[in-house]
């Protein structure tokens, strides 16, 4: 599916006004070959621990988007080249991460969309802490499981339902 978030905002100004379509703050950068991605949100809330990220990406993605509230930590990465390849193999459409990625050159080779704050060479811990399928606070919007995410180079949108 090809789209532009700018066009979606223009076409759905009524939903923007109602709050059923929300724009995340412009702090996310794309780190993959994919120019745009969208899908139903699966949410995680973790902090500097990516064990739950891996466990989730090991499941069939079925075109969904993994939305991770990593607390905005810039101290370590929660997604790198191996997890991006795993996401691609299992059919995930994308990842939106309020935190860091690493292995940026490897991420540029995958077709799974990845939007994150920045990079960090340090890996996250693997303690297995965190929560799944909860509402998460990302810069600019609350994201609930089952909502829809649309992302491209211009930004990341969250919609209460799939957009036409």
Swiss-Prot record:
Belongs to the class II aldolase/RraA-like family. Its EC number is 4.1.3.17, 4.1.1.112. Keywords: Lyase, Metal-binding. InterPro entries: RraA, RraA/RraA-like, RraA/RraA-like_sf. It comes from the Bacteria. It catalyses: 4-hydroxy-4-methyl-2-oxoglutarate = 2 pyruvate; oxaloacetate + H(+) = pyruvate + CO2. The keyword Cell division does not apply. Divalent metal cation. SUPFAM superfamilies: RraA-like. It holds the Pfam family RraA-like. Substrate binds at residues 80-83, 102. This is Putative 4-hydroxy-4-methyl-2-oxoglutarate aldolase. Homotrimer.
């Amino acid at each position: 599916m090809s789209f532009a978030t700018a066009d979606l905002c223009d076409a759905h100004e009524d939903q923007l006004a109602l709050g059923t379509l929300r724009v995340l703050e412009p702090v996310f950068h794309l780190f993959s070959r994919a120019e745009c991605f969208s899908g139903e949100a699966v949410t995680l809330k973790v902090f500097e621990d990516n064990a739950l990220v891996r466990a989730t990406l090991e499941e069939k993605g079925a075109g969904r988007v993994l939305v991770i509230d990593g607390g905005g930590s810039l101290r370590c990465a929660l997604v790198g080249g191996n997890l991006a390849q795993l996401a691609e193999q299992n059919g995930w459409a994308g990842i939106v991460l309020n935190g860091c990625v690493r292995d940026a050159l490897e991420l540029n080779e995958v077709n799974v969309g990845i939007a994150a704050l920045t990079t960090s060479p340090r890996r996250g811990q693997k303690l297995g802490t965190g929560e799944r399928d909860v509402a998460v606070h990302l810069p600019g919007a609350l994201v609930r499981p089952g909502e829809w995410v649309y992302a491209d180079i211009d930004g990341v949108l969250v919609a209460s339902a799939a957009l036409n």
